[in-house]
Design a protein with these regions (language model features):
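Conserved SAM/SAH-binding loop
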Residues: 1-5, 19-21
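Conserved FAD-binding catalytic core of PHBH/FMO-like flavoproteins
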Residues: 2, 15, 28, 32-134, ...
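Active-site-adjacent segment of FAD-dependent monooxygenases/related oxidoreductases
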Residues: 8, 86-88, 213
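Pyridoxal 5′-phosphate
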Residues: 9-11, 172
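Core beta-strand elements of the Rossmann-like FAD/NAD(P) dinucleotide-binding domain
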Residues: 19-28, 32, 148
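Conserved mid-domain beta->alpha element of the FAD-binding
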Residues: 31, 130, 134-215
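Short, cationic motifs built from Arg/Lys/His that form the positively charged side of catalytic pockets
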Residues: 38-42, 92-94, 150, 202-206, ...
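C-terminal helical "tail/cap" subdomain of flavin- and related membrane-associated enzymes
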Residues: 100, 166, 181-257
Length: 257
């Protein structure tokens, strides 16, 4: 694969230098190379925010016998802490939990303990295999600008945040669709107004999403002493149609265009 090593803007475009030494010329460059974007850094675009939240998460893709439905994502707000169990297309499940110390490679016994202490109590779910496991911490950052002349940011190069609420993919797709339209306008007519609108509006949306994901993370990882009150409050709110509808619209981002 080609790897960008640097970028330089010219009077009518930009030049991207690859790690092979090859130089590519383009009218515009979209930096969509992830949180550690080399293009963003080379362009001098800041990436402000919290480096990490003081939380540790474990993640394991596991095969399970019994106990968990294969057609819905479950969030267990248990007294020991949150456990997310999400079915995957191949029949396995992804387990995610906030823990004191996250192992680099969780094994079957570790995943089973999470299920036993935080998962469904009325059924028995048995972990038979860990397909893949890891650990992660949360970064919350938004680029201070999405555009510098011929360089435009999109996706994780422009924003990174907690996975709470599943907002990341929607936000990245929104970037791609909106930026595609803006670039088409700029390339066909030379009008860059839509690029400016993309840079302003997409950054504002990213700030909103980062704030929402932060609040959801704080709610999900509440201190043990207030978890019973949190759980009771969420249980009561779940009976309110307006609350359910509003939450669904927030998570689906259908109220923001």
């Amino acid at each position: 694969p080609y790897v960008a090593a640097g970028v330089k803007q010219t009077a009518d475009g930009a030049e991207v230098t690859l790690d092979s030494g090859e130089v590519i010329q383009a009218q515009y460059v979209v930096a969509a190379d992830g949180m550690n974007s080399k293009i963003r850094d080379a362009a001098g675009l800041g990436f402000d925010g919290r480096d990490t939240l003081p939380l540790n998460f474990t993640l394991a893709d596991v095969r399970i016998e019994g106990g968990l439905p294969k057609d819905e994502v479950l969030l267990y707000f248990s007294r020991p802490g949150l456990l997310v169990a999400a079915p995957l297309p191949d029949g396995s499940f992804r387990l995610v939990a906030e823990v004191e110390e996250a192992p680099e490679h969780p094994d079957v016994a570790y995943a089973q303990r999470l299920l036993n202490t935080r998962g469904p109590q009325e059924t028995t779910a048995r972990v038979t295999e860990v397909v893949w496991g890891s650990r992660f911490r949360i970064h919350e950052r938004v680029a201070d600008r999405y555009r510098d002349r011929r360089i435009v940011l999109a996706g994780d190069a422009a924003h990174t945040h907690s996975p709470a609420g599943g907002q990341g993919m929607n936000l990245g797709l929104r970037d791609a669709v909106t930026l595609g339209d803006a670039l088409a306008e700029a390339l066909t007519s030379g009008d860059e107004n839509k690029l400016d609108e993309y840079a302003t509006n997409s950054r504002a949306e990213a700030v909103r999403v980062v704030s929402l994901a932060h609040r959801l993370t704080k709610l999900a990882t509440a201190p043990a002493v207030i978890r019973p009150a949190r759980n009771a409050g969420l249980h009561l709110l779940s009976y309110l149609p307006g609350f359910r509808r509003g939450l669904a619209e927030q998570l689906a981002a259908i109220g923001h265009r």
